[in-house]
Amino acid sequence: MLTLDQARSKMLEQLPFPTQTEYLNLQEAANRICAEDIISPINVPSFDNSAMDGYAVRLSDLQQSLTLSVAGKSFAGNPFQEEWPSKSAVRIMTGAMIPEGTDAVIMQEQVTLNEDGTITFSELPKPNQNIRRIGEDVKKGDVVLEQGAQLTPVSLPLLASLGIAEVKCYRQLKVGVLSTGDELVEVGKPLQSGQIYDTNRFTVKLLLEKLHCEVIDLGLLPDNEAEFEKAFIAAQSQADLVITSGGVSVGEADFTKAVLEKVGQVNFWKIAIKPGKPFAFGKLENAWFCGLPGNPVSALVTFYQLVQPLIAKLQGQKQWKKPPHFSAIATMNLKKAVGRLDFQRGFYYINEQGQIEVQSVGFQGSHLFSAFVKSNCFIVLEQERGNVSAGETVTIEPFNHLLG
């Protein structure tokens, strides 16, 4: 069996970057992936301006006295454009263009207004004090966003500040989702004996929406090999990626691997993690394929650890960053068998001494989904590690925005 890192690397090596692009206005482009380097067409600021309400001064006027007359005012959008006499200052507001020749801006709190209309400064300013120089933030010609960057509520306003109204993005990834199993029933319908609700398809659709994919609901499949084949052929004509849950184990009714081999190719279908050992990755004729385990916890873990980076690559992100890991002190004994990388659900917190502590949230069976609701991290127990005693150090992986 492949390790998690081996499986992840094997997937990402095979996946191509997208080629189809479209131009979108900034509002439509939120959370999409930039398809080219974005070059600033202007300087930001585009002119020297004041960082404070105060007075613009020339240092040469302050060599003999800290008292000056006031020559006029400069407002944002209405700059001072008159002749600037010597031995005088210009009243200026935040963001206003500074008069030509200004060496510094003295904030108004450091100024005394005299009865004769002059002003006196409490101290000699430093050169360039409280001045925002042209191009200080962004210079014309700078690469402000690289190809493969996600367009976020932080980066999009930057583009707006540069006067860029639309951006070239990769086409939204289309992902088809289906569940398999005679025992599954649509959420909201009454259960009969031996039936369970199809939570996996619901879960996967929610996760895909958070990853900003276009979701295609392909419904429920019965445990029938001919139906599997028919559905897989139809799905790959609609989607860039097809995700199934269930049918990837070795039971008599588990047809996913056999059908995938028939109509496409299987790259791998077992990985050394718990939960989530039966995970299939391969390719249909026109779409990539991921087969998640049927157990809800296993499906969520494999989506988080394997499908999430796969989607990032197919969306055009240049590099998927592994989630951060931290050391924590286990506050209770943890059961673990040697042989597989184990992702146990846990809850971490900072104790009174400033140390990170973590506790298990209960039974860790792959069918026990309620523990996820009480969790905020995975307790990551290495493949070669056995049982953990309270007080030992373990690795935790806090949930990112996908599970938040």
From Swiss-Prot:
Details of cofactor binding: Binds 1 Mg(2+) ion per subunit.
Keyword Cytoplasm: no
EC number: 2.10.1.1
GO molecular function: metal ion binding; molybdopterin molybdotransferase activity
Cysteine pairings via disulfide bonds: none
Family: Belongs to the MoeA family.
Function of the molecule: Catalyzes the insertion of molybdate into adenylated molybdopterin with the concomitant release of AMP.
Protein name, as recorded: Molybdopterin molybdenumtransferase
Originating organism: Haemophilus influenzae (strain ATCC 51907 / DSM 11121 / KW20 / Rd)
Name of the gene: moeA
